[in-house]
Amino acid sequence: MKIDYLTLFPEMFEGVLNHSILKRAQDKGIINVNTINFRDYSINKHNQVDDYPFGGGQGMVLKPEPVFNAMEDINRNEHTRVILMCPQGRPFTQEIAQELSEAKHIVFICGHYEGYDERIRKHLVTDEISMGDYVLTGGELPAMTMTDAIVRLIPGVLGNQASHQDDSFSDGLLEFPQYTRPREYKNMSVPEVLLSGNHAHIDQWRHEQKLIRTYEKRPDLLEQYPLTEKDREILETYKKKLKND
């Protein structure tokens, strides 16, 4: 996968891209990343990339020329996903991360200031993505977050490709509780079922815990999850237990 970042602050990406999973993915040749400072494509002698909005208003707006010019230097085709990081976009989810992990080329447009000239949005962008109902100073941090979520799903990136299959949201539920050694710590014990060696019982316990944890922390996710009759029984039993405690 090729990943290009159009940004005014390419140095922001150095720490994230040069460590951990993203660095290993580059070392393996699975991803090829490139940061492009679109200030270098300004047609203004002062390298200006923003201007006041027509019609008045607060803040500055990114000019179209630097972004369009930078995009012309990127070798892309009709399959390239050009992502605009903006609060108006569709909320980023694990499902979108999985979808984008199958792309061959992604371009992130990371803006600053008040916003973008609308012509950038209309004529260059294939996807508008939001990280949530809040506003950040620029698109760099969301682009880094998305990159991490996307790249770890590409085959060959993780040491054990099945590692992400139990992650929260991978099947629509939150992840089950995890334990490691020591078995006892400050009078807190690991659940006996995890020490039993009975993998069928362990799988059942983990699924029950995923249902319960999702009900406790993100009940909205259960509205979309295809609950079986057994799942409903598990949740009803848990609800009754809560009432009796």
Curated annotation (Swiss-Prot):
Binding residues for S-adenosyl-L-methionine: G111, M131, G132, D133, Y134, V135, L136
Entry GO CC: cytosol
Pfam families, per the entry: tRNA_m1G_MT (PF01746)
Compartments where located: Cytoplasm
GO biological process assignments: tRNA N1-guanine methylation
Catalytic activity entry: guanosine(37) in tRNA + S-adenosyl-L-methionine = N(1)-methylguanosine(37) in tRNA + S-adenosyl-L-homocysteine + H(+)
Coiled coil: none
SUPFAM superfamilies xrefs: alpha/beta knot
Top-level lineage group: Bacteria
Keyword Cytoplasm included in the entry's annotation: yes
Keywords noted in UniProt: Cytoplasm, Methyltransferase, S-adenosyl-L-methionine, Transferase, tRNA processing
Record-listed E.C. numbers: 2.1.1.228
GO MF assignments: tRNA (guanine(37)-N1)-methyltransferase activity
InterPro entries xrefs: Alpha/beta_knot_MTases, tRNA_m1G_MeTrfase_C_sf, tRNA_m1G_MeTrfase_TrmD, tRNA_m1G_MTases_N, tRNA_MeTrfase_TRMD/TRM10
Assembly behavior: Homodimer.
Family: Belongs to the RNA methyltransferase TrmD family.
Function per UniProt: Specifically methylates guanosine-37 in various tRNAs.
Name of the protein in question: tRNA (guanine-N(1)-)-methyltransferase
Organism: Staphylococcus epidermidis (strain ATCC 35984 / DSM 28319 / BCRC 17069 / CCUG 31568 / BM 3577 / RP62A)
Taxonomic lineage from the root: Bacteria, Bacillati, Bacillota, Bacilli, Bacillales
Name of the coding gene: trmD
